[in-house]
Each structure stands twice: as C-alpha cells, then as structure tokens.
Amino acid sequence: MISVNDFRTGLTISVDNALWQVLDFQHVKPGKGAAFVRSKLRNIRTGSVQEKTFRAGEKVEKAHIENRRMQYLYASGEAHVFMDNGTYEQIELGEKQIERELKFLKENMEVAIMTYQGEVLGVELPNTVELQVTETEPGIKGDTASNVTKPATLETGLVVQVPIFINEGEMLIINTGEGKYVSRA
C-alpha cells in the first residue's frame, strides 16, 4: 500500500480492480475542509484517461509492473511475435493489444513488454525510433515560408508531417509518445 501523498508521475496503482498509471497529480489544501489529491490516471488495459480525487493520506495498492526486455521478431497474421533475449522464450500479442505501438515497430527492434502477475499488458516503446521515408512529395525550390511541412509515409505505414527538405529513402528520428518528426537520423 502507498499513500496518495507519495504519488509520482509514472507510478502504477491498482484502484477498483483496475491498473492505473499516474499521469499528473496535484496536492490541494483548501482554506476550509480537508486536503486532497487531484490526479489524472490512465487505465493501462484500455488506455482511457480519468480524473480521480483522493483524500489526503488515503492508501491505494501499488501495482508492481514488470518490464521484460524483448525483441520484436515478426508478424504472423493478426499475431505479433516477441522473443526474450535471455531465455529465448517467445510470446504472441494480438493486434488489438498493441494497436498504437504497431505504427512504430520494426523487425528486430528492442522493446519492453509490461507484465502484471503474469498477464501481458502491452509494449513500452523507446522514446524515439528510426524509420525510413517510403513516400513523400518532392520539395519545391523556393517554397520556403517558415515551418513549411508536408506529409511523409514511413516504412511502418505511419504518416507524419516533415519539413519540405526531407526526401524518400531518408532515415528519420520519430518521437513515439507524440508520433512526430524529431530530426534526420
């Protein structure tokens, strides 16, 4: 058990038989009445975000999420196969479980698989990934107003806005949290 006064961003808790990750929190001490903690939580299984208020000093159960380093091997129909580099154990995850992460996954990529009491919860991607541009319009010389962007399709099918000087075949660094272009690789 952990006190809500000890909340930190990224902490995983179990409330009402659901696993939640603390996205944001604020300790509030009103002039009249008891102090409380206002928090923004993300359900780990469904991805939904909810605001929840706790009384100051209230106890919640801390969920111990285990992260296992694994390598993405390949897709087989709707299943996606990952391998533990230490034990060579392979697990399959369905497309629905990793729908958002699929836009960033390449074969042989190292990721962290999140598990809770033996149940696979999902994939934790690195902060940035390198992906190749497979399709984009050519930049037109002289078309240089400030911050001009164009859509580019990457090798995983992800479409991002990139500066006009980016061409097909180039490797880009993409932020996985926002799904946006960072720089050339």
Curated annotation (Swiss-Prot):
It comes from the Bacteria. GO terms for biological process: peptide biosynthetic process. Gene3D superfamilies: 2.30.30.30, Nucleic acid-binding proteins. It comes from Bacillus cereus (strain G9842). The gene is efp. Keywords: Cytoplasm, Elongation factor, Protein biosynthesis. The lineage of its organism: Bacteria, Bacillati, Bacillota, Bacilli, Bacillales. SMART domains: EFP, Elong-fact-P_C. NCBIfam families: efp, PRK00529.1. This is Elongation factor P.
